[in-house]
């Protein structure tokens, strides 16, 4: 997360800082308490908790609307109900996006159509 305003941090690297859906994305990602702080300048990497940083990443996804979403341990700092809510949110808001996740929790399987498990000896689809 770059230093500067929270608005710049949420919109990093290439989202319009005045995106009309910015407040809505934060609210959907359970970060509504940050809306009033968008123009505050600070070291947000240190100010926000690991879970908040992960939810900021989900807000970026909602704003950027990518066709391909790659998530590597993207919910490791979140509890399982919040993880489930965010994955459901992505599926609902971005139904045509491809989501590829890497994670250790078995709870991620329900949000994906296909799974691949990697073991020491190799992988199994």
List where the protein language model places each region.
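ABC-fold ATPase nucleotide-binding domain signature/coupling loops
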Residues: 2, 29-56, 60, 121
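ABC ATPase nucleotide-binding domain helical subdomain, centered on the C-loop/LSGGQ "ABC signature"
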Residues: 7-43, 87-88, 96
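Conserved signature/switch motifs of ABC ATPase nucleotide-binding domains
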Residues: 64, 95
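Catalytic Walker B motif of ABC-type/P-loop ATPase nucleotide-binding domains
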Residues: 69-73
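Short active-site loops of ABC-family nucleotide-binding domains
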Residues: 76-77
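Helix N-cap at the start of a conserved alpha-helix in ABC-type nucleotide-binding domains
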Residues: 80-81
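Conserved H-loop
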Residues: 96-104
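Conserved catalytic segment of ABC-fold P-loop ATPases
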Residues: 98, 110-118
């Amino acid at each position: 997360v770059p230093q500067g305003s929270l608005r710049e941090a949420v919109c990093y690297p290439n989202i319009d800082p005045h995106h009309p859906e910015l407040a809505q994305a934060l609210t959907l990602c359970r970060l509504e308490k940050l809306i009033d702080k968008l123009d505050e300048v600070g070291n947000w990497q240190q100010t926000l908790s690991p879970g908040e940083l992960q939810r900021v990443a989900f807000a970026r996804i909602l704003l950027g609307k990518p066709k391909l979403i790659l998530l590597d341990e993207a919910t490791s700092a979140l509890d399982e109900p919040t993880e489930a809510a965010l994955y459901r949110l992505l599926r609902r808001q971005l139904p045509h996006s491809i989501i590829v996740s890497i994670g250790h929790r078995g709870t991620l399987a329900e949000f994906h159509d296909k799974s691949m498990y990697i073991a020491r000896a190799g992988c199994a689809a």
